[in-house]
Amino acid sequence: YEVTEPGEEERQDMNPSVPWYTTGAGTKTYMVGTLSDETIEQTVDDEIRAQYMGMEEEAAKNSLLPAILWRNSVDTAKIFCVNGDYLADISAVGILDAMMGETYDYDIYPVINAQNLVIADLPAFVSENEEEMQKRYSQSAQAVYQEIVWPSLTSIASRTGAKMTCMMTPQFTYTDEEEPDGENVTYYLKRLKEEHAEAGLSADSREGIPLSEKIKQDQTFWQTYAPSYRFLSLYADGVKSIGEESALPAEIRTVALGSGASGQAVGYLNENVTLQPSTSSGIRHTFLDDFKVKCMETALGYSNITLDLYSVTYPEGDEDSWEKMSKKIAANLGTYWKAYEAFDATTLTESDVRIRRFLALDYKQQRAGNVITLPLEHREDAAWFLLRLHGEKVTEVAGGSFEEIEDGVYLILAEEDEVSVKVQNGETWQYQDGGKRGDGT
């Protein structure tokens, strides 16, 4: 991660100060800190330089750069080193899985296979912040969302292949005399259906009223304008904003958390409701954000981009204009998530189903000759695995299918309770307990 173009300086948020380790012979380095030629010239002494005599200049320079992630071996053991705090947050799950993939001749593990795009606080059903909306857009909030924001979002989703889940609130302000007008609810629900998208509920409000009170006040609105629509997902800025879990509507099956909860992993809020924290805001994508997304995709095949439109209605500065926000989300989705197109685009309720299956799945694995066998327990419909190979190719899958998503990495779809993966140019391995990763829950 290096600033190479004007304007990228604001993306650089990785720790620039780390201990400077130069690695020895037999080391495989995965990540290094970058230094200018001048800094290397002024800092590296002749004794260290002598160790790299005879190497090509560029190779010697790369060997001198401060190592961040590297691996060495002692007899048959492989020792991995992490120079920094990269194992202190959610990034650890991806780093550890990558280490496992580098340790063995092959590695296979389950993933969720879900890529969400959550649009929080869309659309507007009341003319809130009217003066500011007129000043910026010469239209009411309702018109801004229907005539400007909505067409832009559908265009972005169409170009990127993303599926939207729009988290709706009748209003942000409950202490004024303005009442929401739901005449456009049917319009949006129809448009969402056409886009293969869905609607959920938003817990946001300006006054921060308890969720139970907000749900109570919103209930009449939804019963009047969307009596037959089942809202199965809810958006909240964080777990604390949910308050008492009993306040959740009975039909809610999953809760999406805002970008402030990006350090958490998917799981259960309670025995009935899953939790899907944001993995990115979609607007701001720093180098560290990108690294965390890569780690999450490596470990789980999962991302949950959360674009909160509250700031469109209540902007704090020029950066909150929809023109600038839409350009950023379109550029980021089209650039930084392109590498993960092999994973499925999903809505929140679709990813909720996959998360439940992922967490319930038990599996074992064994290899004999060219065949890797996966016996599965508690499989409910489809399950997905990532298989990492070194110098081998998958040629056939019985009980499912496969797709090579990058060199040596395969996405395996399991459709039966036992899956056999045939690889090319393999030898025969027999693994005893503790000798190979693969048993898992």
Language model features by range: what are they?
Residues E406-T441:
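C-terminal beta-strand-rich structural cap/linker in extracellular carbohydrate-active enzymes
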Residues P249-H285:
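His/Asp/Glu-enriched short active-site or ligand-binding loop at hydrolase and phosphoryl-transfer sites
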Residues G84-R191:
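Active-site beta->alpha N-cap acidic-glycine motif
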Residues G84-D85, Y104-Y109, N113-V126, S152-A157, ...:
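Catalytic grooves of carbohydrate-active enzymes
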Residues A345-G391:
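Surface beta-strand/loop "capping" patches
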Residues P6-A114:
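A glycine-centered loop/beta-turn motif at secondary-structure junctions
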Residues P123-S127, P151-A247, N304, L309-S311:
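Metal-dependent polysaccharide deacetylase catalytic core of the NodB/CE4 family, i.e.
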Residues V93, R191, S205-A226, E271-E297:
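Alpha-helical scaffold elements lining the catalytic groove of polysaccharide deacetylases
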